[in-house]
Swiss-Prot record:
It comes from the Bacteria. Pathway: Cofactor biosynthesis; adenosylcobalamin biosynthesis. Signal peptide: none annotated. One of its GO terms (molecular function) is ABC-type vitamin B12 transporter activity. The active site is at C331 (nucleophile), H434. The gene is cobQ. It comes from Variovorax paradoxus (strain S110). The lineage of its organism: Bacteria, Pseudomonadati, Pseudomonadota, Betaproteobacteria, Burkholderiales. This is Cobyric acid synthase. InterPro entries: Class_I_gatase-like (IPR029062), CobQ/CobB/MinD/ParA_Nub-bd_dom (IPR002586), CobQ_GATase1 (IPR033949), CobQ_N (IPR047045), CobQ_synth (IPR004459), GATase_3 (IPR011698), P-loop_NTPase (IPR027417). GO terms for biological process: cobalamin biosynthetic process. PANTHER family: COBYRIC ACID SYNTHASE (PTHR21343:SF1), DETHIOBIOTIN SYNTHETASE (PTHR21343). Residues 250-442 form the GATase cobBQ-type domain. Keywords: Cobalamin biosynthesis, Glutamine amidotransferase. Catalyzes amidations at positions B, D, E, and G on adenosylcobyrinic A,C-diamide. NH(2) groups are provided by glutamine, and one molecule of ATP is hydrogenolyzed for each amidation.
């Protein structure tokens, strides 16, 4: 068959593009087709390690949904925000210092040939490419430099769905306004409107879908009910701030939500572990009652550490640890738990650590990006159940961490090559490996239970859209 490209555009960020793209990937894969996802440019601090470097987490999961091997071509340009006005640029999996220093308008034309080449290569190798847009295609101030929405749609001759979040209100205005602001020649690419996150009786929407079709010539092809527990992380850049619990709560895990939090998607499985309540904390009050406090990854470790101190969270974490409460630091969180952050190259900034682990971290120019599998050594205290447990995960960091030479008695390595450290008391654990809570063996060791498998999650997504799209629409998009 001729390769078809199906594209998911959205009226806003957070409309549901990422999970709908994953659902489409699995739906088409279940038809026996060879499928790949694609997103030209992603802005996210949620990244995964693949062959050749790193890509946005959303495209990583979409590839798994498509039963494909994740590939840097699926997300050729990744922007990782470090400050409000500055992002690290990752091109084809590798950090580019040149592009990072370049104004974004000039950057767009520079990278477009590689984006087009990556997309063309995926089209040549697959039956279907499911493309995700970014934000809205009707941002008229950005159209001249667009490399992720309509320019991609035109290049791929994609059949596009436009999805909107009806729960926000104003969905029909969003759909009509987006259509109206699109260049007339591009409107022909739209094959259907999708209403996402609907609550209530869908018949009450009439006659709005029919009126919208009369105005635009485009039918509403799906009304998707609100479904919070679909099992995938929220769209990149959208922070799911609710706490989650599966069943009666026996343990509360509070993750500190600093401004430049990264790889927060690795905590997604905790939402579905029986007895575990996952909460996000920005204030000392939100840490109260936590059994475990987790300091996650950070794209700006010293800056997030300063923010943490300004909120008084440092004192709350120290008090929790002093009471014997369990504390876990992952990557940037591990670095914060140490004695000092040393930055000789101006990468992240110098800062004193929280002093809960006897470690010193030096930020190096070279970035470590790799898959890792390792085995915990003998642990004590709150983390004893992880003793001798194998864990598979990934590393993404500039820091290199070692024991403070004068404090060796206060802690020790509990994984080869300095991948994990524990304090002498046994209640504070630092880990460079991302993915602890995604590892089945680790989940079982920590909780005696496991979250649903990703494969079951993807099949659930495919079943959901199969039930709620108008008959024949999904097949018609690739006919």
């Amino acid at each position: 068959m001729t390769t078809r490209c199906v594209m998911v555009l959205g009226t806003t960020s957070g409309a549901g593009k990422s999970w709908l793209t994953a659902a489409l990937c699995r739906w088409y894969a279940r038809q026996g087709l060879k499928v790949a996802p694609f997103k030209a440019q992603n802005m996210s601090n949620n990244a995964r390690v693949v062959g050749g470097g790193e890509i946005g987490s959303a495209q990583y999961f979409q590839a798994l949904a498509a039963r494909a091997v994740p590939d840097v071509r699926m997300n050729p340009l990744l922007l990782k925000p470090e400050r409000d006005t500055h992002s690290q640029v990752v091109l084809m999996g590798q950090v580019s210092a040149e592009l990072t220093a370049m104004p974004w308008r000039g950057r767009s034309e520079r990278v477009w040939p590689q984006i087009a080449q990556a997309l063309d290569a995926l089209r040549a190798e697959n039956d279907v490419v499911v493309i995700e847009g970014a934000g809205s295609p009707a941002e008229i101030n950005l159209m001249a430099s667009d490399i992720v929405n309509l320019r991609v749609a035109r290049h791929a001759d994609a059949r596009c769905l436009l999805v909107t979040d009806i729960d926000r209100g104003g969905a029909f205005a969003h759909l009509y306004g987006t259509w109206a602001l699109m260049p007339e020649s591009d409107r022909a690419l739209l094959r259907g409107f999708v209403l996402n996150k609907f609550r209530g009786d869908a018949s009450l929407l009439a006659p709005a879908p029919q009126q919208l079709q009369a105005l635009t010539g485009i039918a509403t092809v799906a009304t998707l009910p609100m479904w919070r527990e679909h099992g995938l992380p929220e769209e990149d850049g959208v922070f799911d701030d609710r706490s989650h619990a599966s069943g009666a709560v026996t343990r509360t895990v509070a993750v500190v939500a600093y401004p430049r939090i990264s790889n927060l998607d690795e905590f997604q499985p905790l939402k579905n572990v029986p007895g575990v309540r996952l909460a996000w904390a920005r204030t000392p009050a939100e840490l109260a009652g936590a059994d475990w406090i987790v300091l996650p990854g950070s794209k700006h470790t010293s800056g997030d550490l300063a923010w943490l101190r300004a909120q008084g969270l440092d004192r709350a974490i120290a008090a929790h640890a002093a009471r014997g409460g369990a504390v876990l630091g992952v990557c940037g969180g591990l670095q914060m738990l140490g004695e000092a952050l040393v930055d000789p190259h101006g990468i992240d900034g110098n800062a004193p650590g929280l002093g809960l682990l006897p470690l010193v971290t030096v930020f190096e120019r070279e970035k470590t990006v790799r898959h890792r599998a390792a085995v915990f050594g003998q642990l004590g205290g709150a983390w004893a159940s992880l003793s001798n447990v194998p864990v598979a995960g990934y590393e993404i960091h500039h820091g290199q961490t070692a024991i403070h030479p004068q404090m060796a008695q206060d802690g020790h390595a509990v994984m080869p090559e300095g991948l994990a450290w524990q304090n002498a008391r046994g209640n504070v654990l630092g880990l460079y490996l991302h993915g602890l809570f995604e590892d089945a063996a680790a989940l079982h060791a920590l909780f005696g239970a496991a979250a649903p498998t990703l494969d079951a999650t993807f099949d659930g997504l495919a079943d959901f859209i199969d039930n709620h799209f108008e008959a024949g629409v999904l097949q018609g998009l690739i006919a």
